[in-house]
Amino acid sequence: MNIDEIKQRLNAYFINDKIEVFDSRGTGDHFSIIVISNKFINVSLVDRHRMIYSIFEDKIVTDIHALQIQAYTLEEWKGKKDI
């Protein structure tokens, strides 16, 4: 998979939300994802990750070796000072 394919899948689920994707190693199989969405309100961190992993369940292991996920609500993101 490439960055555009990952963004396309995420945008289909997180419509009009903020999404950033980075190829962590430049190898096309390790990615860092930042998703800022109010769909995460009252959702645990584990469940946020599950939501995102479910979008890629057919690509994990075969095309994606690792995903680093940062998932925030809009309010949580506004409170971040180090990003």
Regions found by a protein language model. Give the residues of each.
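N-proximal, solvent-exposed amphipathic alpha-helical segments enriched in charged/polar residues
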Residues: 1-17
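Short loop/turn motifs enriched for small/polar and acidic residues
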Residues: 24, 36, 70-74
